[in-house]
C-alpha cells in the first residue's frame, strides 16, 4: 500500500493516519511523538453520504486484484496491516529530497482531522473553494494528473505550479511512474523515446540540505536532527525510540558544525586555527567570539528617549505636592465634622478617602515614563546583508508565527477576517520566516472557505503591494482611503495595476459575501440528493411494505462534495460548536527558500510581476477539537492550541497575536518589534506590546473608544518600570516566555523606588556563571540543570513539542555581536532552509490540539495563556512579569495595527463590563499583585494592584454622585460652612489636577479633548458597568455563579450608507439604569434646592451653590451618556423615561418621608412645602 521509500504516497479520496499505540486506561490514542512511533499512512474511502470509512475487505480485494477468500479473523487485521517491501534492485527508494517535496505537496492539499478516540485522517482536497485556486502554494491548486492508466497521482510540479515533464513530448507522468519507467528501460511511455535525463535530481532540483555529519552507524538523520539545537543532552531526556541509537545525544553532543550556525562556538584560542570564519572547524565547547564580531562597529537597534527634564521634573513635583495637599485636606475633613449632617459628612469622607487611595495607585506608576525608537536600517544591516558568515545575504531574522483568532462568523464577519489575513501575508518580513495561523474556534465552514478565498486573492494582492509599496496593506482600508492614491507613485503602470486589483477585489468581496448563501444552496442540493438515494434504497428493500419517511441529518457540505468535519449549519452529533473534531488545513504551503519572481502576462497573473517576489507566507487553518465534558477555556484555550500546533509545524521563536478585526496598518511593524527582541538585553524581554488604534469611531469620540489616556499615558509610564501590561492583541511574544520559563539573569527587587533610583546588588560570580550556561530555567526546579524528564508533565506527551523548545530558545536569542550581549547566538545560524512539511508532522499537530491533550499538564496554569479569568490577557502578562520578564511598549510613527471598536453605547458598556469583571476576578484570585514575587518591581506591583482594585471605586463613586442631590434635598452640605480653608484646599487640589493633566498631555502627545472624554467615560463606566462587575465578581466568589459573555459584534466593513449608524442605535440594557437615575435625581434636586432657597425666609445661598456646583459636575460628566440616549434625532425609548421617572420620584418621596422639612419653612407665604 505504501512505497518503501515513503515518497510515493498513492492515495484515493483520503488517507488515514492512525496511531499505533493506545493507553490501557481509557483507550485514548497516544500522540505519535509520545510513544515514539511515527504516524502510519493507511487508507480510507468516502461514502456517497460524504462520510469516511475504512476500506472493507471487498474494497481492498478489488483495489489489489485479490479474488481469493479471506477468513473473517484475518480480515480486520488486514485492514490496518502495513507492509514494508525491502529495497531490491527492482524496488529502490526514492531520493529523500524528492520524496519530501512530493509529500509536502500531498500534505498541502489535504484536510487533516482527528481527535478523541478517533483516527487522524488526511482527506485529499480536489478543490477547496468553488473558484479556481491559481497560486501553486495554495491548497487545491490546479495540477495535472498522471497519464499512466490506473494512476491518479499528480504530476510533478515546480515552485510556480507548472508541470515538470521529463520528455520533450510533454507526456504527463508522476514521480513514481517516472521512476518505474527509468527502471524498465528508460523509455517515455508516451513517445517511446529514451529519456535524456534519467535521474530525479536532474528533473527536479534537489532541495539543499544542512551539512551536518552523518550519525554513526550509518543511521539516517531524522527530521528533528536536521533542526538547530542548543541544549546538551541528559540521561533523562526523551530518547528516540529506535532502540539502537540515541539521536538526541548525537545531535546535542556532536563535534560537527556548519559555520556559525552551530550552537557552540570554538574557544578563543581556536578562532585563529580555523574555528571561525564560517569554515566549520572543531568545537571546543567554549564561548569565545569570532574575530569578525569585534572588528565591526556596533550599533544598537533601539534607543530609549527620556522625557525632557523640563516636563518630567515639574510633573513629579506636582504629584508630590498634590499627594501632600490631599493628605492635609483629608486630615482637615476628618477633624472638622458637620454636626448638623453627620451622615452626609461621614459618607463624603469615606468616599474621599477611597478616591485619594485610588488616585495614588493610579498616579504612582506614572513617575517614570519613557519613549523608545527603533533603527530599521541597522536591523537590515545586521540580519540581511551579506557577511563572511552569510555570503548569500539570506535573512538571519528569526521565524515569526502570527495568530489570528475568530470564533463566530455571525458576529465577526469573514470579510473583516480575510482582510486581516491579507494584511499579514503582505507584511514586510522575510516570506520564508513568516507563518500565519487562523484559529476558528467555531469550526465554521464559512470561515474556512473565506480563508481559502483570501489565500486565492493574495496571489494578486501581495505582489501588488510589494511592487508599489502599498500602505496600508489591508485592501478594504486601502481602497477606502480619502487621500489621493496616486500621490508619490513613480511607476508608470501603477494606475493600470490599481484598477485591475480594485476590480478583482470587488469580485472577491462579492464571493465572500455570497459564501453563506452558496454553502446553504450547496448543502441543500447534496442533502436532497442523499434523501432521494435513501428513499430509493428504502423502497427497494421494503418492496410492498409501508415506507416511512426518511430522516437524514442535514449536513454541511464542502466544495469537493464531502461532509464538513466541523460545525454544521444545523448542528448534529459531533458537528456542533462544542462537539467537533480537530481540523488543520495548510491553505498555503511553506514557500521556497529563494525568491521566486513572476512573469509578465502569466496565466493567473495578468499584472507584470517580473521584478517582484511572488512567494506567499505559510497560511494554516486550525480549529481545535471540542467535545462535551471538556472545558474549552474560551479564547485562552484556543490560543494555547495554536501555540502547540505552531510549535510542531513551524516553531517560530516569536509569536504575534491579533484579533480578527485588527489588521497590519504598518507593513514594517513586525521588524520594529523584532528590533527590541534582537537588541542587546533583548533575551530578557518577554513580549513587545503595540498600542491599539481604532478606525470607524465618530469624530468626537463620544465614548472614549480611542482610549488614548490608557495607551499613551499609562502604558508609556509602565514602559519605564518593567513594561506595559498585555492587552490581548497586537503583542509580540517570546515563545519560551509563554512556556513558563524564567528569563536569563533575573533579579529580585526589594526597594520601592527601584525604577527611578536603581540599587546595585552584589551577585555571586558562580551564580551568574551558572545562569549564563543554563539555557532554560524554571523557578519550579531547584536543580541547576533542567530535568527534561519533567517536561511531559508540563507540556504533554508530544516529543515533537518538547524537542522544539530548546530550538525556539536558541533561535530567539539576539546576535552575539557585542561583548555586552549575553546569551547570544552567532550570525548565520538561521540562514539554513526550513524543513518541508510531512504527514506525520501535521498528524502530530492534530494530536496536540485535541480536547484531551491538556489533561494532567500545566497548560493554562503555568504554561501558555492562563485560564480562570475573562481577561486572560492581563493575567498572562502578569505571570510573565512575576517571573522576572520585562516587556516593551513599541509606539511606531505609523500605527502598527488598527482595529475596530464598538461605538454603540450598549456595546461599549458591555465591553467595559467584561474588562471590569476580569479585574474583579483577578483581585479575588492568586493573581492578586499583593501576592507577587520579589522579581516584580514595587511600582509594577502597584500598577497591577490598581488593575484589580479600580472596579471597586464604582461603589464610592455612585454614592458621591448622589451626595449633591442629597445635599440639595436636605438643605445641608458636606461641610458646615464654605469657609476659606475648605475653598483653598478645593482650589489647590483642582489646580494641581489640571496642571498634571497639562503635563501629561505634554509628554504623552494626547489632546485636551481626549483627556476630557476619558474623564467623562470614567464616570459613565464607573456608575454602570463597574458596579455590575463588582456584583458579578462577588457572586462568583461567594456563590460560585459562573460568568459568561458574548462576543462583541464587529462591523462588516462594507456599510457605505452611514459609517456611524451604530452610534445612534439605542439598545436597552440594565446597565443604563444607575446613570439615568443619577441624572434625574440631580436634576430634580437642583429644582428643589433652587425653589427652597428662593422662597425661604433666610436663603442659604452658599449651600445651594455648593450643591448645584457638584450636581453640574456630575451632569457634565454624564453628558455623552445622555446624548447617546437621544439617538439620531432625539428619539429616546419610552422605557427610558418610564424607568428614570419612576425611580427618581420614588427616591425623592422616600427622602422627603425620611427627613421632612421643618414646619416654619414657609414658601410663598401660604404654601407649605410637604
UniProtKB/Swiss-Prot annotation:
Signal peptide: none annotated. InterPro entries: Cellulose_synth (IPR005150), Nucleotide-diphossugar_trans (IPR029044), Znf_RING/FYVE/PHD (IPR013083). GO terms for biological process: cell wall organization; cellulose biosynthetic process; plant-type primary cell wall biogenesis. Its EC number is 2.4.1.-. Keywords: Cell wall biogenesis/degradation, Coiled coil, Glycosyltransferase, Golgi apparatus, Membrane, Transferase, Transmembrane, Transmembrane helix. It is a multi-pass membrane protein. Pfam families: Cellulose_synt, zf-RING_4. The chain crosses the membrane at residues 311-331, 341-361, 955-975, 981-1001, 1027-1047, 1070-1090, 1104-1124, 1134-1154. Residues 527-551 form a coiled coil. The active site is at residues 441, 873. Its main location: Golgi. It comes from the Eukaryota. Residues 10-24 have a biased composition (Low complexity). Residues 273-288 have a biased composition (Gly residues). This is Cellulose synthase-like protein D2. The lineage of its organism: Eukaryota, Viridiplantae, Streptophyta, Embryophyta, Tracheophyta. The gene is CSLD2.
Amino acid at each position: 500500500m505504501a512505497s518503501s521509500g515513503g515518497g510515493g504516497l498513492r492515495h484515493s479520496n483520503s488517507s488515514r493516519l492512525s496511531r499505533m499505540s493506545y493507553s490501557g486506561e481509557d483507550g485514548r490514542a497516544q500522540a505519535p511523538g509520545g510513544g515514539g512511533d511515527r504516524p502510519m499512512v493507511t487508507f480510507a474511502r468516502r461514502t456517497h453520504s460524504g462520510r469516511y470509512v475504512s476500506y472493507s475487505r471487498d474494497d481492498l480485494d478489488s483495489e489489489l486484484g485479490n479474488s481469493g477468500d479471506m477468513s473473517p479473523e484475518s480480515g480486520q487485521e488486514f485492514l490496518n496491516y502495513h507492509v514494508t517491501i525491502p529495497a531490491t534492485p527492482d524496488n529502490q527508494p526514492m531520493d529523500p529530497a524528492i520524496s519530501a517535496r512530493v509529500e509536502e505537496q500531498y500534505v498541502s492539499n489535504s484536510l487533516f482531522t482527528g481527535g478523541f478516540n478517533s483516527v487522524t485522517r488526511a482527506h485529499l482536497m480536489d478543490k477547496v473553494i468553488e473558484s479556481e485556486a491559481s497560486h501553486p502554494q495554495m491548497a487545491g491548486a490546479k495540477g495535472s494528473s498522471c497519464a499512466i492508466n490506473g494512476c491518479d497521482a499528480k504530476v510533478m510540479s515546480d515552485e510556480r505550479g507548472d508541470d515538470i515533464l521529463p520528455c520533450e513530448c510533454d507526456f504527463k507522468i508522476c514521480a513514481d511512474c517516472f521512476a518505474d519507467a527509468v527502471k524498465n528501460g528508460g523509455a517515455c511511455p508516451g513517445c517511446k523515446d529514451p529519456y535524456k535525463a534519467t535521474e530525479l535530481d536532474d528533473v527536479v532540483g534537489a532541495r539543499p540540505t544542512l551539512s551536518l555529519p552523518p550519525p554513526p552507524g550509518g543511521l539516517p538523520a531524522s527530521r528533528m536532527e536536521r533542526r538547530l539545537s542548543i541544549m546538551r543532552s541528559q540521561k533523562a531526556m526523551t530518547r528516540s525510540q529506535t532502540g539502537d541509537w540515541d539521536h538526541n545525544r548525537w545531535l546535542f553532543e556532536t563535534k560537527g558544525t556548519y559555520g556559525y550556525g552551530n550552537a557552540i562556538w570554538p574557544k578563543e584560542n581556536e578562532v585563529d586555527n580555523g574555528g571561525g570564519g564560517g569554515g566549520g572547524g572543531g568545537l571546543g565547547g567554549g564561548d569565545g567570539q569570532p574575530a569578525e564580531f569585534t572588528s565591526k562597529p556596533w550599533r544598537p537597534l533601539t534607543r530609549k528617549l527620556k522625557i525632557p527634564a523640563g516636563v518630567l521634573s515639574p510633573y513629579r513635583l506636582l504629584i508630590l505636592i498634590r499627594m501632600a495637599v490631599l493628605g492635609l485636606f483629608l486630615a482637615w475633613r476628618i477633624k472638622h465634622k458637620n454636626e448638623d449632617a453627620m451622615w452626609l459628612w461621614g459618607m463624603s469622607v469615606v468616599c474621599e478617602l477611597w478616591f485619594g487611595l485610588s488616585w495614588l495607585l493610579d498616579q504612582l506608576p506614572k513617575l517614570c515614563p519613557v519613549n523608545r525608537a527603533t533603527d530599521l536600517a541597522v536591523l537590515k544591516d545586521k540580519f540581511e546583508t551579506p557577511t563572511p558568515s552569510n555570503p548569500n545575504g539570506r535573512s538571519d531574522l528569526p521565524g515569526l508565527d502570527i495568530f489570528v483568532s475568530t470564533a463566530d462568523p455571525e458576529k465577526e464577519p469573514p470579510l473583516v477576517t480575510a482582510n486581516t489575513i491579507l494584511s499579514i501575508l503582505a507584511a514586510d518580513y522575510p516570506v520564508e520566516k513568516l507563518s500565519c495561523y487562523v484559529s476558528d474556534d467555531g469550526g465554521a465552514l464559512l470561515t474556512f472557505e473565506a480563508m481559502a478565498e483570501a489565500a486565492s486573492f493574495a496571489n494578486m494582492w501581495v505582489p501588488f503591494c510589494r511592487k508599489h509599496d502599498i500602505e496600508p496593506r489591508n485592501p478594504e482600508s486601502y481602497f477606502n482611503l480619502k487621500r489621493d492614491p496616486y500621490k508619490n507613485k513613480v511607476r508608470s503602470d501603477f494606475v493600470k495595476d490599481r484598477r485591475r486589483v480594485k476590480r478583482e477585489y470587488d469580485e472577491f468581496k462579492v464571493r465572500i459575501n455570497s459564501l453563506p448563501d452558496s454553502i446553504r444552496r450547496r448543502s441543500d442540493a447534496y442533502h436532497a440528493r442523499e434523501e432521494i438515494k435513501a428513499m430509493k434504497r428504502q423502497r427497494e428493500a421494503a418492496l410492498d411494505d409501508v415506507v416511512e419517511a426518511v430522516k437524514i441529518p442535514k449536513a454541511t457540505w464542502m466544495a469537493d462534495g464531502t461532509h464538513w468535519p466541523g460545525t454544521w449549519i444545523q448542528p448534529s452529533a459531533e458537528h456542533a460548536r462544542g462537539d467537533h473534531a480537530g481540523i488543520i488545513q495548510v491553505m498555503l504551503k511553506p514557500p521556497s527558500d529563494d525568491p521566486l519572481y513572476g512573469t509578465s502576462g502569466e496565466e493567473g497573473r495578468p499584472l507584470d510581476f517580473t521584478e517582484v517576489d511572488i512567494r506567499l507566507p505559510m497560511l494554516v487553518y486550525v480549529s481545535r477539537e471540542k467535545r462535551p465534558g471538556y472545558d474549552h477555556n474560551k479564547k485562552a484555550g484556543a490560543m494555547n492550541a495554536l501555540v502547540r500546533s505552531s510549535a510542531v509545524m513551524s516553531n517560530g521563536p516569536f509569536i504575534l497575536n491579533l484579533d480578527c478585526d485588527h489588521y497590519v496598518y504598518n507593513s514594517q511593524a513586525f521588524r520594529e518589534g523584532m528590533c527590541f527582541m534582537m537588541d542587546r538585553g533583548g533575551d530578557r524581554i518577554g513580549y513587545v506590546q503595540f498600542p491599539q488604534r481604532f478606525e470607524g469611531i465618530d469624530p468626537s469620540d463620544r465614548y472614549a473608544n480611542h482610549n488614548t489616556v490608557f495607551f499613551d499615558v499609562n502604558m508609556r509610564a509602565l514602559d519605564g518600570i518593567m513594561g506595559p501590561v498585555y492587552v490581548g492583541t497586537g503583542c509580540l511574544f517570546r515563545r519560551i516566555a509563554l512556556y513558563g520559563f524564567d528569563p536569563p539573569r533575573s533579579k529580585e527587587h526589594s526597594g520601592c523606588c527601584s525604577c527611578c533610583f536603581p540599587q546595585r546588588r552584589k551577585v555571586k560570580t558562580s551564580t551568574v556563571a551558572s545562569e549564563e550556561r543554563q539555557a532554560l530555567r524554571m523557578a519550579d526546579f531547584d536543580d541547576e540543570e533542567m530535568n527534561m524528564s519533567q517536561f511531559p508533565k508540563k507540556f504533554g506527551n508530544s516529543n515533537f513539542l518538547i524537542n522544539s523548545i530548546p530550538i525556539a530558545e536558541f533561535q530567539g536569542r539576539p546576535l552575539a555581536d557585542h561583548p555586552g550581549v549575553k546569551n547570544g547566538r552567532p550570525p548565520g545560524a538561521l540562514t539554513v532552509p526550513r524543513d518541508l512539511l510531512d504527514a506525520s508532522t501535521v498528524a502530530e499537530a492534530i494530536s496536540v490540539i485535541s480536547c484531551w491533550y491538556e489533561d494532567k499538564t500545566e497548560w493554562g496554569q503555568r504554561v501558555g495563556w492562563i485560564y480562570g479569568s475573562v481577561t486572560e490577557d492581563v493575567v498572562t502578562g502578569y505571570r510573565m512579569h512575576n517571573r522576572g520578564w520585562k516587556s516593551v511598549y513599541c509606539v511606531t510613527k505609523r500605527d502598527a495595527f488598527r482595529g475596530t471598536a464598538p461605538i454603540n453605547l450598549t456595546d461599549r458598556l458591555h465591553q467595559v463590563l467584561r474588562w471590569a469583571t476580569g479585574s474583579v476576578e483577578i483581585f479575588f484570585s492568586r493573581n492578586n499583585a499583593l501576592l507577587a514575587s520579589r522579581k516584580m518591581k514595587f511600582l509594577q506591583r502597584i500598577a497591577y494592584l490598581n488593575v484589580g482594585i479600580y472596579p471597586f471605586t464604582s461603589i464610592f463613586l455612585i454614592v458621591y454622585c448622589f451626595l449633591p442631590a442629597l445635599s440639595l434635598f436636605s438643605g445641608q452640605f458636606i461641610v458646615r460652612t464654605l469657609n476659606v480653608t475648605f475653598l483653598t484646599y478645593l482650589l489647590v487640589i483642582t489646580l494641581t489636577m489640571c496642571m498634571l493633566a497639562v503635563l501629561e498631555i505634554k509628554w504623552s502627545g494626547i489632546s485636551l479633548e481626549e483627556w476630557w472624554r476619558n474623564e467623562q467615560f470614567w464616570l459613565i463606566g464607573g456608575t454602570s458597568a463597574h458596579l455590575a462587575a463588582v456584583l458579578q465578581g462577588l457572586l462568583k466568589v461567594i456563590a460560585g455563579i459562573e460568568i459568561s459573555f458574548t462576543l462583541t459584534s464587529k462591523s462588516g466593513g462594507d456599510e457605505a450608507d452611514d459609517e456611524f449608524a451604530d452610534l445612534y442605535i439605542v439598545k436597552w440594557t440594565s446597565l443604563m439604569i444607575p446613570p439615568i437615575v443619577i441624572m434625574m435625581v440631580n436634576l430634580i434636586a437642583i429644582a428643589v434646592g433652587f425653589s427652597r432657597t428662593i422662597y425661604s425666609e433666610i436663603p442659604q445661598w452658599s449651600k445651594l451653590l455648593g450643591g448645584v456646583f457638584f450636581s453640574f459636575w456630575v451632569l457634565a460628566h454624564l453628558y455623552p451618556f445622555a446624548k447617546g440616549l437621544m439617538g439620531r434625532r432625539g428619539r429616546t425609548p419610552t422605557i427610558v423615561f418610564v424607568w428614570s421617572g419612576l425611580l427618581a420620584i420614588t427616591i425623592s418621596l422616600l427622602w422627603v418621608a425620611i427627613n421632612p422639612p421643618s414646619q416654619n419653612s414657609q414658601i410663598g407665604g401660604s404654601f407649605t412645602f410637604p
